[in-house]
Amino acid sequence: MKVHFIAIGGSAMHNLAIALKIKGFEVTGSDDEIFDPAKGRLAKYGILPDDIGWHPEKITPDLDAVILGMHAREDNPELLKAKELGLRIYSYPEYLYEQSKDKIRVVVGGSHGKTTITSMIIHVLQHQHIDCDYMVGAQLEGFEVMVRLSDTAKVMVIEGDEYLTSPIDRRPKFHVYHPTIGIISGIAWDHINVFPTFENYVEQFEIFAKMIPADGQLIYCQEDEELRKLGERISNTTRKPYGVHPYYIQDGITYLKDGEKSYPLQIFGKHNLMNINAARLACNALGLTDEQFYEAIVSFKGASKRLELVAKSSECAVYKDFAHSPSKLKATINAVREQYPDRKLVACMELHTFSSLTEEFLQQYAHAMDEADVAMVYYSPAAVQHKKLPAIHPEMIFKAFEREDLQVFNDSEKLQKALLETDWHKSVLLLMSSGNFDGINLNQFGEKIVFSRA
């Protein structure tokens, strides 16, 4: 099989390209920009494009498939050439479905927790030596790539994003996967540039749930009021609601309770205890017992940038997290607050996504950082301009978060200076962003904060 990727540098795209290369396909690709880690990983597998940019001459009649990334535009010269030649053009969700249509597909949807739940299921299946294919949105410890496609696995576990499939396909990605077992972790309005109303956003999850066959399962979080109402409207498949798994915290370690037994975890937070229940029900649906699930989950360390410990001493700990939406922000701060009740909690987040930099959506952040002792918000005026959005002013952020002592920064150097000058005695720093605060190496910065005081 000969496959070409248009926009090979994307997170999901380059992982799919590597997965197909591992499978023995002949893989080529193009992009107008490729950064690390994608650049280094593509080079390692011998599929990094020789030249940056679009090259229509790479689109030849002998290609079996052209896979189109979201980064490419409708007028992309390679896409136009592929159409002209009548080649089979797939988005990466379409191609994943094509490769898994004869398998049991576990699709994890929801506004938050998708990556973690997907990672948990994959971890448990691997631990129990159950062959599975997968696509997950973050790097996992012990896994070389975020996508695996094989001819042997009977199950595929897919992180199902609700964002658009491709520039020429306006369907949400998770609709394309046709779930056998569908999980919805929660509904909190996002991607307002695509789903202009909350009702329109919720509708996408209902469509997803109604795609599940009669012999499948819908696993959904009943702690979420909107999801509870949605669940009551679903009659086409078996419904499995879940909530927070019973637990207790002792000496800074969270334990799962199962009758008389308890299991120590390497992760924490009520949101993760809900994620665990979702993963447990999915594994049950695939034939695993609770005991097999618990035996495996105790060694799960979490996905990259999901409450990931950067550095720690007896005095101070630094975590980084992907949290950026209001619901994720609140859940992540609350998790750290519960885990470290006697420490000063400094929460620092970046407004980075299209939605979060929109004045209308900003109002959703009211009281999201109330559980932190110190709250800081960073945004980049250049990012606002790049996204062609109206200018954001610090006063708008103060008003939106409804916190009088909120500290707002729009200069990365000043933010770093403020954090480095903070007294970190008996404290925890939580850095939250889907970006990197305009070029901060979060690992190095976290270590600097912890070990400069050691």
Regions found by a protein language model. Name each.
Residues 253-258:
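Short polybasic amphipathic segments
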Residues 8-9, 30-31, 69-71, 92-93, ...:
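Fold-independent oxyanion-binding glycine-rich loops
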Residues 12-15, 36-37, 142-143, 274:
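Short N-terminal binding/cap micro-motifs at the start of the first secondary-structure element
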Residues 1-34, 42-49, 62-66, 82-87, ...:
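ATP-dependent carboxylate-amine ligase
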Residues 34-39, 57-58, 73-76, 142-143, ...:
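Short, charged/polar "capping" segments at the starts of alpha-helices
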Residues 263-268, 316-320:
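Short pre-catalytic strand/loop immediately N-terminal to key active-site residues, enriched for Gly-Thr
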Residues 19-23, 57-61, 70, 74-220, ...:
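Phosphate-binding loop of NTP-binding sites
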Residues 51-54, 90-97, 135-138, 234-251, ...:
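Beta-strand->loop->alpha-helix junctions that form or flank phosphate-binding loops
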